């Protein structure tokens, strides 16, 4: 955490305090999934985070088009990054749902299916790299929108757009954390127990 805070210019004490405050407000956000099965965690990711990302990207797209009709370099750049984020995420979610998750569930059920990707570490590394790209895009969008804060006198559409982007970012943080630091390590550990030569997983921290 110290390195991440230093890189973002945030005092660690403030970050810890904010986390503790959020835990008091909504403890369900911080449920410990480490003891759950891959099947239960994957189901949660699909029905909660994957569904939310798709719904919000579709909902925010027309708002983005409406808001960026007004000539403004930063808003135009924001639209470019949002379009890239949407394309990137939709492809990423499909890859997970059609390839990665089915393999993980089959492996947990006692199988080690034949694959075109070798060890599960290979698609997981790809997923983590794509998660990093999501983080970079969201950071850039936050910079372009003054931390998703609409200026005084901004229209209602712009306020709704920025609020939606902030909410999307918050959900993506939890989404990517659960995959990078719970689902993927559990999957690699399970595969390692079945195929001992597979490497142990590292821990990843997405910086938004």
Give residue ranges: language-model regions.
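Small-residue-biased structural context
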Residues: 1-208
């Amino acid at each position: 955490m110290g390195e991440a805070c230093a890189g973002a210019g945030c005092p660690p004490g403030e970050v810890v305090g904010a986390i503790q405050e959020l835990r008091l407000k909504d403890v369900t956000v911080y449920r410990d999934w480490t003891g759950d099965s891959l099947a239960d965690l994957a189901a949660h990711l699909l029905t909660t985070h994957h569904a939310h990302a798709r719904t919000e990207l579709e909902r925010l797209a027309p708002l983005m088009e409406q808001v960026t009709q007004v000539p403004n370099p930063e808003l135009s750049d924001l639209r470019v990054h949002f379009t890239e984020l949407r394309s990137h995420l939709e492809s990423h979610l499909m890859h997970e749902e059609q390839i990665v998750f089915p393999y993980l569930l089959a492996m947990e059920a006692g199988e080690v299916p034949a694959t075109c990707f070798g060890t599960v570490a290979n698609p997981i590394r790809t997923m983590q790299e794509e998660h990093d790209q999501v983080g970079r895009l969201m950071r850039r969008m936050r910079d372009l929108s003054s931390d998703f804060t609409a200026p005084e006198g901004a229209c209602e559409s712009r306020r709704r757009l920025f609020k939606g982007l902030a909410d999307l970012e918050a959900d993506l943080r939890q989404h990517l954390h659960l995959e990078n630091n719970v689902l993927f390590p559990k999957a690699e550990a399970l595969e390692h127990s079945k195929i001992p030569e597979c490497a142990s997983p590292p821990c990843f921290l997405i910086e938004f």
